């Protein structure tokens, strides 16, 4: 995990699973509704709760206890709401995050429709990154189209679910 937001996101996944009805756990209706629902809940917790000053007023004393150092709420909040273009989707702020998802969705559509060949993906990725975020990745493969686990693992069509809770 690279930052507290990642922990808060995964807490959202856990809270969703934890609060499914246990008394009917053996029935399909009591199971998770799929990854779209999972992502909506995790991103809701991250983006709506985890960026709220009231959450950090509550959580900060617990964080301080485990880190063993004092952290100021006034010093922390600007970092939580900082907006800056970046190459990595999972590290993106609340303004640019949807652009990362849209970029991936559009590239997936091109690959699935046959208008974009896989061999042309690095250049197409770079063009979209420059158009949407003003950043180039053409000479930086680790921040290019394989930075997420989805496509190398064959998971296409997943990225739009990341916008449901944002």
Where on the chain are the PLM-derived regions?
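C-terminal substrate/ligand-recognition segments
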Residues: 96, 154-166
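Active-site recognition of the HExxH zinc-binding catalytic motif
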Residues: 1-22, 39-43
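An active-site-proximal "capping" alpha-helix that borders the catalytic cofactor pocket
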Residues: 35-49
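Divalent-cation-assisted or electrostatically stabilized phosphate/pyrophosphate-binding catalytic cores
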Residues: 30-36, 88
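Buried hydrophobic packing segments
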Residues: 15, 42-46, 107-110, 165
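Long, amphipathic alpha-helical stalk/connector segments used for oligomerization, subunit docking
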Residues: 49-153
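Conserved binding/catalytic microenvironments
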Residues: 1-3, 25-32
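Short alpha-helical patches at coil-to-helix transitions and adjacent helical residues
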Residues: 5, 35-39, 100, 104, ...
């Amino acid at each position: 995990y690279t930052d507290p937001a990642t922990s808060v996101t995964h807490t959202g996944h856990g809270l969703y699973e934890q609060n499914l009805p246990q008394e009917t756990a053996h029935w399909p209706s009591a199971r998770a509704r799929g990854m779209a629902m999972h992502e909506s809940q995790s991103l809701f917790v991250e983006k709506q709760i985890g960026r709220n000053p009231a959450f950090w007023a509550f959580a900060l004393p617990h964080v301080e206890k485990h880190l063993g150092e004092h952290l100021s709420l006034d010093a922390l909040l600007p970092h939580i709401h900082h907006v800056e273009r970046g190459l990595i989707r999972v590290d993106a702020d609340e303004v640019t995050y949807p652009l990362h998802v849209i970029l991936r969705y559009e590239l997936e559509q091109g690959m699935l429709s046959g208008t974009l060949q896989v061999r042309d993906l690095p250049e197409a990725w770079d063009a979209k990154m420059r158009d949407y975020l003003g950043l180039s990745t053409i000479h930086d493969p680790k921040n290019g189209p394989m930075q997420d686990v989805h496509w190398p693992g064959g998971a296409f069509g997943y990225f739009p679910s990341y916008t449901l809770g944002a």
